[in-house]
Amino acid sequence: MGPLIAIVGRPNVGKSSLFNKLIGEDVALIADYPGLTRDRNYSGCKIDNSNYILVDTGGITNSSSKFDQLILAETQKAISDADGLIFLVDSSSSINQLDFKINDILRKSGKNYVLVINKSETKESKNNISDFYSLGVKNSFEISAKNGLGMRNFKTSL
């Protein structure tokens, strides 16, 4: 079908919203609270005449609870299986240590990945966006998975 691309990030940064936007259907459930996505969710999609398989993953946390460790294991499997990765962050909140931890996990995976700075349409993002560039990811894009802002430029990069 095409390369496998995993969407990875903290809980509630918009991974499922981006997944739905890219595949063009509301397949993944979306909520205003973290932890709804637990298992990997796969779907094929076509972007600019290229076929992809996308994987929506649960959010990576610092929690040591058994439940969160199971979600982390599922996400690590998706990272391992993927041909490329989308690191999704939420610019409506400040960058934090978990963003740096996830960036380190992705860098150590040896896979190609892009930084996608979501929720860039929010007032809060104006104060936070520049901080995410400190992660040092070569290819970075500012988007809104909710309203489509910046999606064309981002999709061209895939």
Show the residue positions of the predicted features:
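Conserved G1/Walker A P-loop phosphate-binding module
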Residues: 1-81, 89-92, 131
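Conserved nucleotide-binding/hydrolysis micro-motifs of P-loop NTPases
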Residues: 35-36, 59-61, 92-94, 120-124, ...
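Well-ordered alpha-helical segments embedded in enzymatic catalytic cores
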Residues: 70-77, 98-102, 153
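Amphipathic helical hotspot of TIR/SEFIR-family domains
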Residues: 91-111
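Canonical P-loop GTPase G-domain recognition
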Residues: 111-114, 119-158
